[in-house]
Amino acid sequence: MHSFATLSRPARGIIALLGIRDDDRMLSYLPLAHVFERWIGEVTTLTGGYQLFFAESLETFQQDLQRARPTLFISVPRLWLKFQAGVYKKMPPAKLARLLKIPLLNRIVRKKILTALGLDQIRFAGSGSAPIPAELIAWYRGLGLELLEGYGMTENLCYSHLSRPGQVRPGYVGQPYPDVQQRISPEGEVQLRGPGNMLGYYKNPELTQEAFTEDGWLRTGDRGEIDEIGRLKLTGRLKEQFKTSKGKYVVPAPIENKLLLHQEIEQAVVSGSGMEAAYA
């Protein structure tokens, strides 16, 4: 459950952090009931006054993106990978890499690619919901687009962490948003306190109690570590880590992340031998 306060305070926080203006544009394409859409697409739009465009359908998404020409665009690694795959269908990776190394052609090629994607007006590009490969961040940087990775969950309105321009460190999800505090428990769990933290789970006081520590910090269930300037690195889920037959602990996410770099792989699940796993 969220209140008006847990919606509005994060809205003001991200507006201040990103310097969002009333001439900014954004494309809404998630279900309107999604917590991120409620925060960014609804409350933050009303608070900041920027333009919000709506995608007509999945089939028209690319045209909708070109119609909106967003200045703010946040998506998931899977979509950023699809954009890259679409570019590679028209221009092989080796050829693109050669063209980007030619000073006279570099700017022209970058502009052409971003315009075709509908991303040529972007001044803030973000990625979240899953780890994004460092190689993909570097690829977009080569096009002049700095992808800022973020981190959050429904329980804190997705208002948790965001990389800062010029301070992106591959493998890290950035620093806390304004007024968000972070700590690592003795068990290695990331715990958070901030204005977006939920009131609790609807009609489920037992689960609500489990979600918070005795002193009021939100338990994320994620393992992590913090560097010297406060950037958070997620090292896996507390419950997903498994042990091999040789006694070695394995965290699946980094392995899955590497597999997804392959152009022919869309989804990847890593599990231990003999473990139950769902496959589609």
Language model regions located:
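Gly/Ser/Thr-rich phosphate-binding loop
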Residues: 71-74, 83-168, 181, 266
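Short hydrophobic/charged patches on amphipathic alpha-helices used for structural packing
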Residues: 62, 111-114, 209, 256
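Acidic-histidine catalytic/liganding microenvironments
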Residues: 4, 17, 215, 262-263
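Conserved AMP-binding/adenylation subdomain of ANL enzymes
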Residues: 8-25, 32-112, 121, 146
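C-terminal boundary motif of the adenylate-forming
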Residues: 223, 262-279
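Glycine-centered loop/turn positions within well-structured domains
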Residues: 8, 81, 168, 188-190, ...
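Conserved ATP-binding/catalytic segment of the ANL
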Residues: 176-244, 261
